[in-house]
Regions:
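Active-site neighborhood of HAD-like aspartate-dependent phosphohydrolases
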Residues: 1-43
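A metal-dependent, Asp-based hydrolase signature
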Residues: 32, 40, 46-83
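Alpha-helical elements of Rossmann-like donor-binding domains used by nucleotide-donor carbohydrate transfer enzymes
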Residues: 21-22, 37, 64-68, 84, ...
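Short, acidic loop-to-helix structural element flanking the phosphoryl-transfer center
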Residues: 55, 59-60, 77-112, 116-118, ...
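Short helix-capping segments at alpha-helix termini
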Residues: 27-31, 72-77, 128-131, 159-160
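Structured helix-beta-strand junction loops
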Residues: 41, 107-108, 131
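Asp-based, Mg2+/Mn2+-dependent phosphohydrolase catalytic module
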Residues: 1-5, 99, 103, 113, ...
Length: 214
């Protein structure tokens, strides 16, 4: 049994597409398209910045991705709309299965390991009502997941060998990055997607957090 369980935040505990309603309110008929592209560019920019060695906080990456997405989709966005959407990212909804499922993980260290910068992740955790032993941000290292040194941060801060850490993510690229590093990995595959072909496999594939059994 793992001595610690580490969770990704965005897309795993918090639904990144809970911004869709506000997107749709601003641009009727375009909300879903904007939400999807915004998330895709957010990830792309984080990886690109890591490869270039040009770190910027996740809040900046998220804003840049939003502005690109609006430009690409020919959606005019003003300062108030931009701020409203950025504020939405600081109050994303928990997935419905999260609160009850977290009660199962008593007796082990619990942590979040996230690409989110403190100005984005701290408000989310505070409003969630969830308790963690640590909330770890890549902002300390200035590089994004799936860089191995990010997963090492969890080992160091939790003072737990990687072989005794369970890692939970709904993002396959993150799950496989954690597996490559040496964690026991639970991939929450909510959409029934195939495993990415990178030479690694999650230890267990589940459909929701409440299926994760240590």
């Amino acid at each position: 049994m793992p001595r610690a369980i580490v969770f990704d935040a965005y897309g795993t505990l918090f639904d990144v597409h809970s911004v869709l309603a506000r997107c749709e309110a601003f641009w009727p008929g375009k909300g879903a398209q904007l939400s999807q592209l915004w998330r895709a560019k957010q990830l792309e920019y984080s990886w690109q910045r890591s490869l270039m060695g040009r770190y910027a906080p996740f809040s900046q990456v998220t804003e840049d991705a939003l502005l690109f997405s609006c430009e690409f989709l020919a959606l005019k966005i003003d300062g108030k709309e931009k701020q409203a959407l950025m504020d939405e990212y600081r109050r994303l909804a928990l997935y419905p299965d999260v609160s009850a499922a977290m009660k199962k993980f008593k007796g082990v260290k619990r942590a979040i390991l996230t690409n989110g910068s403190p100005d984005m992740i701290d408000p989310l955790v505070a409003q969630s009502g969830l308790a963690f032993d640590a909330v770890l941000s890549v902002d300390e290292l200035k590089i994004y997941k799936p860089a191995p040194q990010v997963y090492q941060l969890a080992v160091d801060r939790l003072a737990t060998p990687k072989e005794q850490i369970g890692f939970v993510s709904s993002n396959c690229w993150d799950a496989l990055g954690a597996k490559s590093f040496g964690f026991t990995v639970y991939w929450i595959n909510r959409t029934g997607a195939p495993v990415d072909r990178t030479g690694f496999q999650p230890d267990r594939i589940v459909k929701s957090l409440d299926e994760v059994l240590l």
